[in-house]
UniProtKB/Swiss-Prot annotation:
Record domain KARI C-terminal knotted: where: 182-327
HAMAP family: IlvC (MF_00435)
Binding sites annotated in the UniProt record for Mg(2+) 2: 190, 226, 230
Protein name in the entry: Ketol-acid reductoisomerase (NADP(+))
Sequence positions that bind substrate: 251
Active site residues of this protein: 107
Keyword entries, A-Z: Amino-acid biosynthesis, Branched-chain amino acid biosynthesis, Magnesium, Metal-binding, NADP, Oxidoreductase
Biological process per Gene Ontology, one example term: L-valine biosynthetic process
Organism: Methanothermobacter thermautotrophicus (strain ATCC 29096 / DSM 1053 / JCM 10044 / NBRC 100330 / Delta H)
Protein residues bound to Mg(2+) 1: 190, 194
Family stated for the protein in its record: Belongs to the ketol-acid reductoisomerase family.
Catalysed conversion reaction: (2R)-2,3-dihydroxy-3-methylbutanoate + NADP(+) = (2S)-2-acetolactate + NADPH + H(+); (2R,3R)-2,3-dihydroxy-3-methylpentanoate + NADP(+) = (S)-2-ethyl-2-hydroxy-3-oxobutanoate + NADPH + H(+)
KARI N-terminal Rossmann domain mapped to chain residues: 1-181
Residue sites binding NADP(+) per the record: 24-27, 47, 52, 82-85, 133
Amino acid sequence: MKIYYENDIDMEILADKKIAVIGYGSQGEAQARNMADSGLNVIVGLRRGGSSWKKAHDDGMNVMTIEDASREADIIHILIPDEIQETVFEQSIRPYLKEGNTISFSHGYNIHYGYIKAPEGVNVTMVAPKGPGAMVRRTYLEGFGIPGLVAVEVDATGDAMEQALAMAKACGLARAGVLETTFREETETDLFGEQAVLCGGVTELINTAFKTLVRAGYQPEIAYFETCHELKLIVDLIYERGFRGMWHNVSNTAEFGGLTRRGRIITEETEKEMDEILKEIQNGKFAKEWALENRAGAPMLKRMRKLESELEIEEVGSKLRKLCGLEK
């Protein structure tokens, strides 16, 4: 796999380009400010009167409506939530695109599943930091950065990859390393990671383990510490040193117990379900389900959010996070 670093990338290709960042949330703010601080001509496109308008203006950004930003820019970098991108694109971006323009994303979802289709003669690229916006900005200011991905779905001008790499460098990503991928690979692996591990799998594992201890008569507070609070310590070890480094830094008892029991938690049946989850991502079933959910006003999501907020582990966790000074 090719990894690009700062010395591999020439930002001169963007010298005469105007870049519109659409959205000013976590990623929008970080990427817009980093690119501006790197000397690029950046404008921010927002809904007039929206909550982010004043924030972006106070940060010194050149703020205008999405329509005006799309009309003025050579590169339109779309960093608003997946579920509203199609509507915003069709209403406020597509009418102003010109041949030779570039539309860029930090997640391939809407391009990969066909909800957004670029007009003829327009590049489609991706610049995707592998971390939250706050970290993208903080590490940039510290003189380093976080790794990132770049991809090209449509190269209408012959230099789309060079543009994407230059944007990644301007965001600070090439300081750590930029990897080339595809829209399909980024989208499908990102969704699978979220569903099977990072957001879905981990929370279900934690809550099930917590309920097991409470059901057996242990104090909920102790159960929380053992199944949730201490998870960060282990994840940090894995993040910094890998599995081997984590095993080396826990007790022999923990290592033996973990290695001999983990296969009883993640079973062959679990692996089959993971395969099924991946298939639903690959064949578009999940994307269709999410689209229908949004068109209906997200009733299932709202209901599940309410149920999550009422979990015992949430009540106990809030109390203990206050005790630890993590929550006010």
